[in-house]
């Protein structure tokens, strides 16, 4: 029992630490798109911060507010996205690299999701799911 509690605590704290600092700004039902909701979040990356591989239960549009991010979807080459630029991810994309391109400056993203109501926007992936 104690081992299970320790495992769950470590897994929970590890998952939260693996995606940058996420701040939810808004969630809103989309009445013209039954069963869907829109969500807006910011994600702050400390200098050199790397997120764990993940996917999203959503179509998402990502605008880089500050700094630069190196991003790579499974099957694609890495790309560097700078402040003022936008990229897109589909629900089937596996995001294998997401990291702040700078070791000295923070980076900040503004993320717009369109997703099924009630589903978590982000799913962290284990080794076998990448």
Label every model-predicted segment.
Residues 8-17:
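Hydrophobic h-region of N-terminal signal peptides that target proteins for export
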Residues 58-75, 83-85:
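Glycine- and acidic-residue-biased ligand/ion/polar-headgroup-sensing regions
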Residues 22-24, 29, 33-36, 100-130:
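Double-stranded beta-helix
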Residues 26-59:
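N-terminal targeting signals for Sec/Tat export/insertion, comprising classic cleavable signal peptides
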Residues 30-34, 45, 75-92:
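Short acidic-glycine-tyrosine-enriched beta hairpin
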Residues 1-7:
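Sec-dependent signal peptide recognition
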Residues 35-40, 59, 76, 92, ...:
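Extracytoplasmic
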Residues 50-52, 70, 87, 91-100:
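Histidine-centered metal-chelating micro-motifs
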């Amino acid at each position: 029992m104690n081992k299970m509690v320790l495992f769950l605590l470590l897994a929970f704290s590890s998952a939260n630490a693996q995606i940058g600092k996420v701040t939810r700004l808004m969630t809103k039902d989309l009445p013209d798109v039954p069963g869907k909701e829109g969500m807006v979040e910011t994600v702050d990356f400390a200098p050199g911060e790397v997120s764990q591989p993940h996917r999203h239960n959503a179509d998402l549009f990502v605008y880089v507010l500050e700094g630069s991010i190196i991003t790579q979807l499974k099957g694609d080459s890495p790309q560097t996205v700078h402040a003022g630029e936008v990229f897109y991810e589909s629900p089937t994309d596996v995001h294998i690299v997401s990291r702040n391109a700078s070791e000295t400056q923070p980076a900040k993203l503004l993320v717009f999701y369109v997703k099924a109501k009630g589903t978590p926007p982000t799913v962290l992936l284990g080794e076998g799911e990448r």
